[in-house]
């Protein structure tokens, strides 16, 4: 092996070690939960309180009336303006949430920018119901 070939092999090995964590497959639960969250957020981003309420999971609908959800959308989400950018910061899973029955929950934190708020956080809680992830909590910070 020539010196150039050896150097390239060593550099390739170092690059492979450096990039190895990126090559691991993402937890399939994270992909599924994030896809469900994106679908729900696409509805919420249209400021359609009725449709986002209907698309949410049963615990969401049990905790809020359609009227209260509509008021929250008008008071909190509407003033933020159009979505500019949304990036997943973290997705975690748990079976226990304070004040809730044990179940499969996904907690997804986003870094989000809107036209009228440069940087904020969105926190979504999803529950696996009937094999599907459904939004059961939504907070903007």
Regions found by a protein language model. Name each.
Residues 91-141:
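Exposed beta-sheet edge and beta->alpha loop/turn motif
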Residues 34-36, 50-103:
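Short solvent-exposed beta->alpha transition segments
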Residues 20, 65, 69, 120-127:
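A generic structural signal for ordered secondary structure
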Residues 2-4, 12, 19-46:
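Short, low-complexity N-terminal intrinsically disordered segments enriched in polar/charged residues
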